[in-house]
Amino acid sequence: MRYPRELKDGAAYHVTSEINRNEMELQSPQIKTMFLTFVKRAKQKYPFQLLDFCIMDNHVHLVIKPENGESLPRIMQWIKGNFARYWNKAHGKKGGHLWGKRFFSKIIDDIRQLLRVLDYIDNNPKRAGLVKRAEDWEFGGLYHHLRGRMDVVTIPRAAMPELCFPSAG
């Protein structure tokens, strides 16, 4: 049975999406870079803030805050659908499923939870043994933040609590 997705106006979400059968289809740096390109394009089409991300070999994590009443499912459908079409074409596939089951999303309820989610996402490559330090993972939001690369992640870390929870400050 498919459960309804929990959605809330103004909320930030921790989103996870896995590759079908846990395959390592996002392994190459070029593919990871192209996924980021589709996220950037989605930001031009739909109003949302990307607070953090981590692209692993078989799944992605995103922290997304839709704006102006935009729909999280619509944003994710666009990113995943367009990236899958690109991936299939690049790999000579006529179709098939790149992504596994539907994406998982959880509303981030407070500042402490936001900080836990950021820590979890940022340290995912370190826990997987891909880097010694979380900040060295080129396909993660922390790497971009620390190097001033604000083309994908556009909100400085210090501003995130106020953006997500304006009444908490």
Residue ranges with predicted function:
Residues M1-M56, K65-G169:
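Short Pro-Cys-Gly-centered "Cys-loop" motif that presents a nucleophilic cysteine in a tight turn
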